[in-house]
Amino acid sequence: MSTAIRSGRQSNWGSFCDWVTNTNNRIYVGWFGVLMIPCLLAATICFIIAFVAAPPVDIDGIREPVAGSLIYGNNIISGAVVPSSNAIGLHFYPIWEAASLDEWLYNGGPFQLVVFHFLIGISAYMGRQWELSYRLGMRPWICVAYSAPLSAAFAVFLVYPFGQGSFSDAMPLGISGTFNYMLVFQAEHNILMHPFHMLGVAGVFGGSLFSAMHGSLVTSSLVRETTESESQNYGYKFGQEEETYNIVAAHGYFGRLIFQYASFNNSRSLHFFLGAWPVIGIWFTSMGISTMAFNLNGFNFNQSILDGQGRVVSTWADVLNRAGLGMEVMHERNAHNFPLDLAAAESTPVALQAPAIG
């Protein structure tokens, strides 16, 4: 009896699936990578072209275009991809929705193309982190940590425009555009007096401090494996089982420098703390941006202290308020959009008596 054996050739689709999910590839692709790669490529290519050559954009919707590209006179610092026009509002504005390419460019269509593809791409990047961790049998905390900057991007590019009613209020894609966004945000929402922003500052600056402290402590307590004439980095071999630094010495040093319980004696809890502190801080900042997007602003302590005769005793809150009003006036280039808090409030005299002339 003879048996016919068919050669089991794998289909092209099967080969593609194996390649996508193969953890031995030099760079892991993954199913999230199939979505991530084209989205980030589209966002990057459009950003570069728009940053270099996009025509001016009517960001305020009042026929006063703002130039952001390099060939229109900007440099690397002042250049930006200008947000889509206030005339577009929150409408989805792909190329096919415009009457012509010139109209699409004039109304800031490239900004939406870049931002939407970018947000999808970085979300897929987080999914790819989870996917690779899952396939390697690792715990999922890498993608959880990455969710902090991801949430910040969604807050400034999506949630804030939704709350304000127009993508023209989103953060411009450029260096000075980012600073302008921050100044206007302070002027309109008093973010410096918002508790969630304070927690975010503590997270970022505290994370930097803890990172520097940890790195310096470890580097200062390395187990000597080299001579004075060799680099200390040669004392570590990738994959070695022995500890490369003396955690007991580091713990003893820091415990005596501050006090005993300020120093971790468990390497795992230490590194969890180093990861959790800045992540939680940035989460709070993202939540703060998202709440202020709907005008739930920072605390207002303006003119909250009065003397016995009812006169205002100025505090730092009043200094912030005056600075914010000044920034808001400079930001609003058109008179019909004059800041409501200036138009409705009583005028504050800047001088008690006019100087005599002549």
UniProtKB/Swiss-Prot annotation:
Q: Which GO terms describe its cellular component?
A: photosystem II; plasma membrane-derived thylakoid membrane
Q: Which parts of the sequence bind [CaMn4O5] cluster? A: 169, 188, 331-332, 341, 343
Q: Which GO terms describe its biological process?
A: photosynthetic electron transport in photosystem II; response to herbicide
Source organism superkingdom: Bacteria
Pro-peptide positions?
A: 344-358
Q: Which InterPro entries match?
A: D1/D2 (IPR055266), Photo_II_D1/D2_sf (IPR036854), Photo_RC_L/M (IPR000484), Photo_RC_L/M_CS (IPR055265), PSII_D1 (IPR005867)
Zinc in keyword set: no
Annotated GO MF terms: chlorophyll binding; electron transporter, transferring electrons within the cyclic electron transport pathway of photosynthesis activity; iron ion binding; oxidoreductase activity, acting on diphenols and related substances as donors, oxygen as acceptor; oxygen evolving activity
What residue ranges are annotated as transmembrane? 28-45, 117-132, 141-155, 196-217, 273-287
Cofactor binding summary note: The D1/D2 heterodimer binds P680, chlorophylls that are the primary electron donor of PSII, and subsequent electron acceptors. It shares a non-heme iron and each subunit binds pheophytin, quinone, additional chlorophylls, carotenoids and lipids. D1 provides most of the ligands for the Mn4-Ca-O5 cluster of the oxygen-evolving complex (OEC). There is also a Cl(-1) ion associated with D1 and D2, which is required for oxygen evolution. The PSII complex binds additional chlorophylls, carotenoids and specific lipids.
Answer whether the UniProt record assigns the keyword Transferase to this protein: no
Spell out the subcellular localization from the entry.
Cellular thylakoid membrane
Q: What is its EC number?
A: 1.10.3.9
In its record, the post-translational modification comment is: Tyr-160 forms a radical intermediate that is referred to as redox-active TyrZ, YZ or Y-Z. C-terminally processed by CtpA; processing is essential to allow assembly of the oxygen-evolving complex and thus photosynthetic growth.
Residues binding chlorophyll a ChlzD1 are: 117
For membrane topology, the record states: Multi-pass membrane protein
Q: Which amino acids does the record list as binding a quinone?
A: 214, 263-264
Sites where the protein binds chlorophyll a PD1: 197
So what does this one do?
Photosystem II (PSII) is a light-driven water:plastoquinone oxidoreductase that uses light energy to abstract electrons from H(2)O, generating O(2) and a proton gradient subsequently used for ATP formation. It consists of a core antenna complex that captures photons, and an electron transfer chain that converts photonic excitation into a charge separation. The D1/D2 (PsbA/PsbD) reaction center heterodimer binds P680, the primary electron donor of PSII as well as several subsequent electron acceptors.
**Mind telling me what this protein is named?**
Photosystem II protein D1 1
User: From what organism does this protein derive?
Assistant: Synechococcus sp. (strain CC9902)
